[in-house]
Amino acid sequence: MRAPAPKEPVTEDLDPAADPYAAYAALRAKGPVHRVRAPGTGDSWLVVTHEAVRAALTDPRLRNDIRHSANWETDGGHAIGRNMLQSDPPQHTRLRRLVAGHFAPGRIAGLRPRMEAVARELLAQLPERGTTDLVSGYALPLPVTVICEVLGVPVADRAAFHTWSNELVMPTSEEAAAGSAGALTGYLTELIAEKTRSPDDSLLATLATTTGDASAGPLPGPGAGGLMPEELLGMAFLLLVAGHETTVNLISATLHSLLAHPDQLARLRADPSLTGGAVEESLRYNSPVHAGAFRFAAEPLDLAGTRIGAGDAVLVSLAAASRDPLAFPDPDRFDITRRPRGHLGFGHGPHHCLGAPLARAEATIALRLLLDRYPFLAFATDPADLTWRTSTLLRGLRELPLRLGRPGGRDSRGPPA
């Protein structure tokens, strides 16, 4: 998506492929809000302090609906259907209410046995010793399998689905992104039609059978209950893509941080009850979502002392906020015993990540079972040589080559022979 251009010259360049945290620190030292231009986007305002980010995420004058952008007719990007991420109350409230119960902590607890079974199946396919890529062999297929099972995506279609999804969230080119958007739209349209004709117990079938009547006019109001066809398409797209992309990054980034800090890995092995804390610290320290979706000023407003024009794009940096020293002492230190309350890894406010309980459960299970199976883990290459998939909004490892020790319990010791 191309964001609208502010009325004054750009003052900063934002390169997501570079070291983002050094760039965020430099910007924070200058102030909470900056004009930036990132590759593939137009000019926008970037919010980088914890206080200002929290304020922006709850400011009703900053809207998610692209139609509040000064250039909304040409800057729609490759959105598929209408979804929660690009809507505002009351539409957002209604859409979120329709699926919130399916991602509540109690519902996710019921999925934990299946998550553990999938994780164990994947671990059994990894070599007993030697090297492997943790992303392709474990961090990716675990959340893909889980969300596809929840929504009812057939096994045979999952590889293609992920290829399209990956191209949309981290595009290699405008043409490739457009092609993936078209392919995924066609696929989801056919899948929804199939779920409507032959409902099963999947979430997508449940949503499909509550679709509203497109001939009834505009969006039904809160409490109407149904989804319009375009909303159902957007909901399927958002749940499938958001339901796995960030979790892949979370699992791999958490292990990366642990391997880069051997003292923390040793502490976790000695006390597995810290696994949840390790995931929370990873969300703060190396957030898989570096920025929330673009917001657009519905009217002129003041944000942390900066004047924002109507129609201007605002980008809130969750990653920068979670490294703010005013909110987190010694923020560049990875500490799994930290209690990082207030981290913004899953956002804040009305658009706080609906799938947070699912992502937390998947990451915690993935980490616990991996460490339990392998008493020795180490980088298989120089960490400095690892490449990160980056976009304005997301950041995650492309691959994570590891050296594996012999599978066994926690009493096993020693590196691979």
Located regions from the model:
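Cytochrome P450
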Residues: 1-417
